């Protein structure tokens, strides 16, 4: 899968990296999880995705055509931010491309930026 970051996401990472020292490693682990969700064969992927989304770990925000926008809890090694970071990304399933759209802490804001999602959805 190909990964890209939108400019606003880079700003989010820069701001949070000051408080969350393990952030880059946490994002790398998230990439492996995304690979498991979307990089498998269709039959394996459907069952794994169903089980993963059934928990409180992630949810599909929007689905238009072959693009899914997903919000996922980002697991971190930094104690004070454990369970509080959220990663929003768009997956173009047919192209095997993932765009990281937003990274935020629940301490800073309660929800994702809807305007940013509309800008990058599709």
Language model region names:
Residues 28, 56-71, 104-117:
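Charged, low-complexity, helix/coiled-coil-prone segments
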Residues 1-40:
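Arg/Lys-rich, positively charged N-terminal/basic patches that mediate binding to nucleic acids
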Residues 74-122:
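Enriched for short, Lys/Arg-rich terminal
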Residues 3, 70, 98:
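A broad, low-specificity signal marking well-ordered, structured residues that form hydrophobic/aromatic
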Residues 21, 25, 39-42, 46, ...:
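Short linear functional motifs in flexible/disordered or boundary regions
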Residues 37-78:
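A short, surface-exposed loop/turn module that caps and links secondary-structure elements
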Residues 16, 50-56, 82-86:
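Short amphipathic alpha-helical surface micro-motifs
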Residues 27-34, 45-48, 106:
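Residue-level signal for alpha-helical context at structural boundaries
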């Amino acid at each position: 899968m190909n990964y890209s970051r939108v400019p606003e996401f880079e700003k989010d990472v820069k701001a949070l990296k000051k408080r969350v020292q393990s952030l880059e490693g946490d994002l790398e682990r998230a990439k492996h999880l995304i690979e498991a969700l979307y990089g498998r064969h269709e039959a394996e992927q459907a069952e794994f995705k169903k089980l993963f989304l059934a928990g409180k770990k992630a949810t599909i925000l929007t689905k238009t055509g072959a693009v899914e926008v997903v919000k996922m809890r980002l697991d971190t090694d930094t104690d004070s931010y454990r369970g509080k970071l959220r990663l929003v990304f768009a997956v173009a399933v047919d192209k095997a491309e993932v765009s990281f759209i937003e990274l935020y802490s629940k301490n800073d804001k309660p929800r994702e930026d809807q305007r940013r999602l509309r800008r990058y959805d599709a």
